[in-house]
Every structure is written in C-alpha cells, then in structure tokens.
A protein has these predicted regions:
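Terminal amphipathic alpha-helical/low-complexity segments used for targeting or macromolecular assembly
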Residues: 1-83
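Structural signal for interior beta-strand "rungs" in well-ordered beta-sheet cores
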Residues: 86-168
Length: 168
C-alpha cells in the first residue's frame, strides 16, 4: 500500500516511465496483430480497414495496453479498460491473460479469455470461444493456473469451450 503523497508520486512516475519505455514493443505487437487480421481474413480490403473497423483488433489493442498496466500493478484501470472493450465489442479479454504475437480474433462476439490464460503466437479465435476456468470445488477458491494454455499456431473454432488449466 502507498503510505504518503511522495510515495504515490514516485510510484506513479515509475509506472509512467515503464509504460512509455514499453510503447515501442506494444506498437510492434499491435502491428503483428494487424498483419494477422489482414492475412487471416480474405474479406479484408486493407490494413487500414482492419485498424479502423475490426472489433477483434480493437479488443486486442485495449488488451495490450491494459495488460501492460496490469503487469505494472496498476489497480482497477486495466480492468475498467477491458470491461469497456467488452461492452463495445462483446469480446472479454482479462488484462491478466498472456497473449503472444500475431493474434487474430475473427467475428469475435462472445469470446472470453480468462485471467490466467496463456495464448501462444499465431493463434486464431472465432466467435463464441471460451478459454475459462472450472468452478471451484466444494466452495474452495481455486488458486494458481485456472485457465487453459493454447500453444503456438492454433485455431479454435466457433463455440468451443476450453476450461481449466490444461494445455491444448
């Protein structure tokens, strides 16, 4: 916890510095996501179309920024960002998830990506996919890895539900 105003200023400055230093890497990841969307959708007319009109890419963009803030232990704001994107797109990506490069969401309504999900590189998700947790057993909270791991070069098609901490 932060004890005084000076400590708050120091923490805020450190988070801002870290975030600003990470912007080139975030941009590089997003450009690979744009390429994945453009390359993966034969209906895409241009990368500009993908950037300005694809809800899946919007959700990925918000996730990438929110995830960076989450990794910096910024409270509440990453979750607010992800919920805003969820409301705008129907795509729910928890900012704690770990998502590799060249990520493509096609027709993304109803996608859920849980907090401890790990997604490799070159992964494609279609509408209605859930990468979720199992319910707690006998009222006990589940700790640790609760969501699936998806390896590289995977495609998960419409309506699939993958639950628990296993690898696919």
């Amino acid at each position: 916890t932060i004890k005084d105003e000076a400590e708050l200023r120091e923490r805020t400055s450190a988070v801002c510095d870290r975030f600003l230093c990470r912007l080139p890497q975030i941009q590089a990841m997003l450009m690979k996501d744009v390429a994945a969307n453009f390359d993966g959708d034969p209906a895409a007319g241009s990368k500009e179309e993908v950037i300005f009109s694809y809800p899946g890419l919007y959700a990925i963009f918000v996730y990438r920024v929110a995830h960076e803030l989450y990794e910096s232990k910024v409270p509440l704001i990453p979750r607010i960002m992800s919920e805003y994107a969820h409301g705008a797109t129907g795509i729910d990506i928890n900012p704690g998830a770990q998502i590799g490069e060249y990520f493509f969401i096609d027709h993304g309504t109803g996608i859920v990506v849980g907090e401890t999900t790990i997604i490799g590189d070159h992964v494609k998700l279609y509408q209605g996919v859930t990468l979720g947790a199992l319910s707690p057993r006998h009222g006990h909270a589940v700790t640790g890895k609760r969501h699936p791991t998806v390896g590289d070069n995977a495609t998960i098609y419409s309506g699939a539900s993958i639950l628990g901490g296993k690898t696919v």
